[in-house]
Amino acid sequence: MGFFKKIKEGLKKTRDAVVGQIDSMLKSFTKIDDELFEELEELLVMGDVGVPTAEKICNELRERVKKEGIKDPSEITSLLKEIIADMLRGGEELDLATSPSIILVIGVNGVGKTTTIGKLANALSKEGKKVILAAADTFRAAAIEQLEIWADRSKCEIIKQKEGSDPAAVIYDAISAAKARHADVIICDTAGRLHNKKHLMDELAKINRVIDRELPDASKEKLLVLDATTGQNAVNQAEQFRQATGITGIVLTKLDGTAKGGVVLAIKDGLGIPVKYIGVGEQIDDLQPFTPDAFADALFSIKE
């Protein structure tokens, strides 16, 4: 299945629920007035875009409508698509400029973190990059085993220690291996942590110190994996992790299983954190690089 078709299918629930309602609402109006904008804002908020972002979209839409002299409500959809694509632009590409580069993957348990790492490793390997996986989620034996399966599937080397080992020591070993084997990217799994588990946040700080000491000039990404089905809770999680540890990007999983795709806008506009990848299915190649234009097109289903 093609790249665009995958995203389009993955956004079907959001498109049907949110964009479908917007489309019906616009058809019920014969002119563009305050009531139309109020209803649009309400529908955007219901679509998990968030109140501040919904207001921002509608204010920009008002200005564009006025400036371009648009009178027909049916013309609003294409403007809305443009505004949303513009809002999502910036920072969506991974920074992997150095060899090795390092990607630290964080998130609470149950969001699809280890699966995301496996799919990302597979995608980068397909691009010809030599990838090493670091099994630094040492709290759960199952996490190490799961990562081993993904390492095998994506044909990547895995660096691991036994359950309960010091996660920072695993990262140190992975960095040493990457230097010795001239690897391009190290992807590090970490324990599923909640913002309020102080020892887990301390552990993350220790991991960061090891990375900064051993790879001071390396390109570093800190990716937070979020479950799209949790809607505004995902936005709250992103804010808490951002404050605690700093985040360079978001991987939004399970978009295909929810009508809450609007959280992409809430995260990028509300928090200023770019979405770098989206998960739109169960298959190994269903983790897709996030591209604002393709996302907006798929959401409004303009192109086939």
Where are these regions (language model features)?
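Charged, compositionally biased N-terminal leader segments and the immediate start
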Residues: 1-25
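Conserved catalytic-core segment of NTP-binding enzymes
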Residues: 146, 167-181, 195-301
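Residue-level signature of catalytic and energy-coupling elements of molecular machines
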Residues: 11, 48-50, 108, 137, ...
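Structured loop/turn residues at secondary-structure junctions
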Residues: 136-139, 163, 229, 255
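Short glycine-rich anion-binding loops that position phosphate/pyrophosphate groups of nucleotides
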Residues: 191-193
